Amino acid sequence: MPHVTDDGRDPRRVPDNWREILDPSEWALNHEGLPSRRAARVIVLRQMPDPAVLLVVGHDFADAGRSWAFTPGGGLRPGESPVQGALRELAEETGIRLTGSDLEGPVVERSAHFAFNLVTCRQDELFYLARLDAELAARADAVRGQDGQMDRSGWTPLECDVLDSLRWWPLDELDAAVGAGMVVHPQALPALARRLLRGWDGKVLTIREEGGD
């Protein structure tokens, strides 16, 4: 067990003003003394015109030099199911509005540390799969701007500050970017995306990542 302060935090990784850094309505200290939350995400894939995955690229709010790519999603609201949260977050972050019948899974269950510059958190996530057919992919492209970016009108002020891009990443381009040093979460996403494009086998992949960005 880590040493925790009287207010329940691990002082090595969590400053006493952590509630000013994170939204305390979403995050609560867990048994490790870390801010923790439950979240839901969507791995959005398309087959045409080229196999691609929809990714957000963002940076550390205290260090713009640290960046990573990840799938749309976020923390669950009180009383919200993971499917409801995944659909809401997808709509807010991308403008893509799907229904529960458009999702498969959860396909991945992930528990991970996020070591930001100022605070380390834990997030327990469920990932759902959305394989967009030609009609759904066209609907997604309809909300894309002239710069190739997806709709960002639903982003919060904080998201506008720390999220840098939202676009389709062709899988070959993603492989090259990761090979050149880009960090992607989950780390297995490039290979996982290729496998899920061929179909989901019904098995939930469990991922535990410690000490990550």
What is the predicted function of each stretch?
Residues 2, 137-213:
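Nudix hydrolase/Nudix homology domain
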Residues 55, 127-129, 166-168:
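Conserved hydrophobic/aromatic beta-strand scaffold that supports enzyme active sites
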